Each structure stands twice: as structure tokens, then as C-alpha cells.
């Protein structure tokens, strides 16, 4: 039986969760920052966080996407939020939509600037927006970025501006 008020969050990596190595200037993964972000935001939602992988989305494979799809399909939650790198977020959203997972609202969000960079990160805003949208949008697959929601097949990332935009 589905827990209708549960929001399942799947962590997949992306800039959202990258750390900065002050010695060599490289970005790397350690652990997700979601528990700290939710605590800072005084979040009172019923949330379960599960890390599926920690990868840069440019390195995400079809096998990684199958893991995401499998977890979305088997989840008891009807509301699923996926943190994901922005470069291939639309590709993953397409794969999820084409899997035809029924009766679930699935949203993907990410960040252009790592949470570890502090208040300059857009991750706080995107996560909060995604948590709101996953509770209010109808069943389907969506990208949530920059305070907006986009249907999975009507969005692209503008690589010049770093913003997500509607497509016809």
C-alpha cells in the first residue's frame, strides 16, 4: 500500500552534491547534503532519502538510468524527487517517462552551483521548489529548475545562459 504523504528522494549526484578540494581545485563527491539542507530549511515533510549513486551526469550511463527507473517503479511513494546533474537531466527524464511508471509524480532537480559553495548555490531554491511542485503537479515526469516546472518533453537546458527553457 502506498504511503500517500511520503516523498521519496533519490540522490544521483550532480553538481548539487559536489565538494570543492581547496588544495587542487577539483570538485568531487563525498556524501549528499540533503539532510543538512532539509534541516536548515526546517522541513516538516515526510521524506525518505536514498542515495542511488553519486555521479556527474555527463558520466551517467544507460545502466545508471535503469537503476533510477527501477527504484522509481518499485517505490511505495507516489511523489518522487530525484536530484540529478543538469547536463543530462532531460535525457534521464525522457527515459523515466518512456518507462511509463503509473500513478506517480516524478520530478528532477539539480544545481548549477554546489551546495558546498554556500549561499551562492541555487540548490536550496531548486530543492524547495521541487518539494512544492512534487506535491502539487499531476502524475507525470517533470524538470524543476529556476523556480519553474517543465514537462519532460518540453524543456531544454540553454548551455549559454545555464537556464532551463521551454521548447515547442
Where in this protein do the model-derived segments appear?
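Active-site histidine-anchored catalytic micro-motif
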Residues: 2-168
Amino acid at each position: 500500500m502506498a504511503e500517500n504523504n511520503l516523498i521519496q528522494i533519490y540522490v544521483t549526484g550532480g553538481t548539487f552534491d559536489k565538494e570543492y578540494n581547496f588544495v587542487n581545485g577539483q570538485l568531487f563527491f563525498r556524501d549528499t547534503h540533503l539532510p543538512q539542507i532539509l534541516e536548515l530549511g526546517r522541513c516538516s515533510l515526510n521524506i525518505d532519502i536514498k542515495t542511488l549513486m553519486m555521479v556527474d551526469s555527463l558520466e551517467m550511463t544507460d545502466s545508471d538510468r535503469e537503476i533510477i527507473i527501477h527504484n522509481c517503479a518499485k517505490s511505495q511513494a507516489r511523489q518522487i524527487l530525484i536530484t540529478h546533474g543538469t547536463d543530462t537531466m532531460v535525457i534521464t527524464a525522457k527515459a523515466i517517462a518512456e518507462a511509463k511508471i503509473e500513478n506517480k509524480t516524478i520530478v528532477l532537480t539539480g544545481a548549477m552551483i554546489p551546495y558546498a559553495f554556500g549561499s551562492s548555490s541555487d540548490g536550496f531554491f531548486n530543492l524547495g521548489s521541487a518539494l512544492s511542485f512534487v506535491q502539487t503537479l499531476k502524475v507525470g515526469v517533470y524538470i524543476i529548475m529556476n523556480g519553474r516546472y517543465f514537462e519532460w518533453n518540453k524543456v531544454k537546458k540553454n548551455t549559454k545562459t545555464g537556464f532551463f527553457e521551454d521548447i515547442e
